[in-house]
């Protein structure tokens, strides 16, 4: 049985989530403390910090890792408003959607220099398959690349400051805010990047992928990071962070949304770049019993935009549906580069399904409806 937060709709199975004696999760508690934050003071801290890294025309002031999504569009807009000269860096996603390409081009039109690093697609497809079958995450190589490539760019272009968006795991401003020891280490990057227990070196020793094919997935050495003084900050620590308002600001600056709620979601303004995202989100549902619709519903419940009851109904309607398509692209075509059939994919799904949280028949087999959807044992506390 799943236990749910009494304020939002997040189950206790979410990694790093804790539900206290009152039945409230730590994410809701943390959000409640935001009203006590002096955002004016935080903004001044941000301006002071950014001032230390301004190059006054001699180089870029900072690196902004961007995907083309609403949040990275917002980050670029804010950096420009604050008078910085950012270098935008993209580690191109696995299966870039047309709308994702459009939003990347839109960021360029905001008036920034832009580096787009596209991985070897044959190697990436192998890594997608390895990630999916070994750790249940088709997006494993993408999640590695979005941290390694900006760090490599920082070293290569001698730009110490990396400006990330929101840090969902830690309530702090990032290493750049530290009075000392503020240079990123390889260990910090690997821990923050979240490798899910599979190291890049494993790929060479176990799967025969040569190190020369994995350069973009490896962090710079500590010596390289120290030489440049690479550090980073999280913009969401210094400015109030809200996905919906970020989306509205991004839209006002040319960002394009989908023509309907994205499959498995409840909104049309996020995760628009990669056709593989539906698979990634579905595996989160299989492992932990929640997915994208739950994530978004919780954000809106905490901000009093929807009631908890409405959130429960939205989650039941949208969360964890079998990913037959994403952004309109059929599952079979998404799996083609991985050389995997839909039947093979379903077998992998079953291997990673947490059978303790889904309904089964008398023989222990998972119960699925005619669309292949699972049903959780419970969608709320009894």
Q: Language-model segments: which ranges?
A:
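Nucleotide-activated chemistry modules centered on ATP-dependent adenylation/adenylyltransferase
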Residues: 1-62, 78-382
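Short, glycine-rich nucleotide/cofactor-binding loops
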Residues: 62-71
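Long, structured ligand/cofactor-binding scaffold of large enzymes
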Residues: 74-76
């Amino acid at each position: 049985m799943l236990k749910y937060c009494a304020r939002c709709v997040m189950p206790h199975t979410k990694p790093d989530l804790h539900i206290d004696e009152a039945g409230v999760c730590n994410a809701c508690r943390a959000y409640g403390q935001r009203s006590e934050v002096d955002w004016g003071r935080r903004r001044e801290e941000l301006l002071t910090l950014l001032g230390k890294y301004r190059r006054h025309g001699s180089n870029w002031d900072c690196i902004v890792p961007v995907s083309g999504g609403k949040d990275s569009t917002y980050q670029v807009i804010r950096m420009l408003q604050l008078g910085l000269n950012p270098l935008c860096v993209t580690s191109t996603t696995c299966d870039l959607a047309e709308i994702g390409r459009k939003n990347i081009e839109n960021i360029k039109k905001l008036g920034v220099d832009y580096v787009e690093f596209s991985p070897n697609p044959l190697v990436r497809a192998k890594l997608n398959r390895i990630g999916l079958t070994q750790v249940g995450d088709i997006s494993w190589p993408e999640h590695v690349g979005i941290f390694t490539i900006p760090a490599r760019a920082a070293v290569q272009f001698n730009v110490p400051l990396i400006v990330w968006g929101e840090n969902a795991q830690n309530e702090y401003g990032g290493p750049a805010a530290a009075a000392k020891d503020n240079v990123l280490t390889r260990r910090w990057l690997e821990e923050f990047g979240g490798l899910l227990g599979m190291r890049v070196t494993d790929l060479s020793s176990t799967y025969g992928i040569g190190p020369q094919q994995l350069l973009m997935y490896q962090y710079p050495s500590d010596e390289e990071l120290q030489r440049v003084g690479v550090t980073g900050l999280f913009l969401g620590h210094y400015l109030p962070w809200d996905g919906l308002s970020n989306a509205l600001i991004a839209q006002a600056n040319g960002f394009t949304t989908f023509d309907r709620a994205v499959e498995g979601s409840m909104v049309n303004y996020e995760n628009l770049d990669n056709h593989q995202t539906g698979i990634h989100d579905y595996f989160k549902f299989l492992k932990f019993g929640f997915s994208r619709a739950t994530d978004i519903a919780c954000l809106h419940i905490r901000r009093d935009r929807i009631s908890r009851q409405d959130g429960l109904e939205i989650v039941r309607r949208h969360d964890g549906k079998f990913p037959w398509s994403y952004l309109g692209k059929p599952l079979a075509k998404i799996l083609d580069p991985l050389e995997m059939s839909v039947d093979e994919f379903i077998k992998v799904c079953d291997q990673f399904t947490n059978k303790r949280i889904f309904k089964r028949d008398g023989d222990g087999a998972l119960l699925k409806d005619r669309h292949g959807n699972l049903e959780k044992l419970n969608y709320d506390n009894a």
